[in-house]
C-alpha cells in the first residue's frame, strides 16, 4: 500500500470519527435536556411557593441572576 493511500485512509477515518462523535454528543445532550430541562422563572416561583415563601418578582430575579452567575 503506497504511503499516500495510508494517509488518506487515516484522514477519512479521523473525519468520520469526528462526525460520528458530534452526532452522538448532540443526541445525548438533546435527550439530557429533554429529561432535565433548565430551570426557569415559573419553576422557581413554584419552588418558592412550595417552601412557603411568597415569591416576589425581585426575589425571583435575584435568584435567577445568582444561578446564571454560578453557571458561568
UniProtKB/Swiss-Prot annotation:
Q: Where in the cell is it found?
A: Cell membrane
Per the record's keyword annotation, is Cell membrane included, yes or no?
yes
Record key words, sorted:
Cell membrane, Membrane, Transmembrane, Transmembrane helix
Chain ranges passing through the membrane = 3-23
Source organism superkingdom: Bacteria
Which Pfam family, an example, fits this chain? UPF0154
Topology term for the membrane: Single-pass membrane protein
Q: Provide one Gene Ontology cellular component.
A: plasma membrane
Classification via InterPro entries: UPF0154 (IPR005359)
| Disulfide bonding pattern of the chain | none
Would you identify the family this protein belongs to, as annotated? Belongs to the UPF0154 family.
Q: What is this protein called?
A: UPF0154 protein Bcer98_2334
Per the UniProt record, the source organism is Bacillus cytotoxicus (strain DSM 22905 / CIP 110041 / 391-98 / NVH 391-98)
Amino acid at each position: 500500500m503506497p504511503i499516500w493511500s495510508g494517509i488518506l485512509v487515516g484522514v477519512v477515518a479521523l473525519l468520520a470519527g469526528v462526525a460520528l462523535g458530534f452526532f452522538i454528543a448532540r443526541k445525548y445532550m438533546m435527550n439530557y435536556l429533554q429529561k432535565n430541562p433548565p430551570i426557569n422563572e415559573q419553576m422557581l416561583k413554584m419552588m418558592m411557593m412550595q417552601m412557603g415563601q411568597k415569591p416576589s418578582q425581585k426575589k425571583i430575579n435575584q435568584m435567577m441572576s445568582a444561578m446564571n452567575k454560578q453557571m458561568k
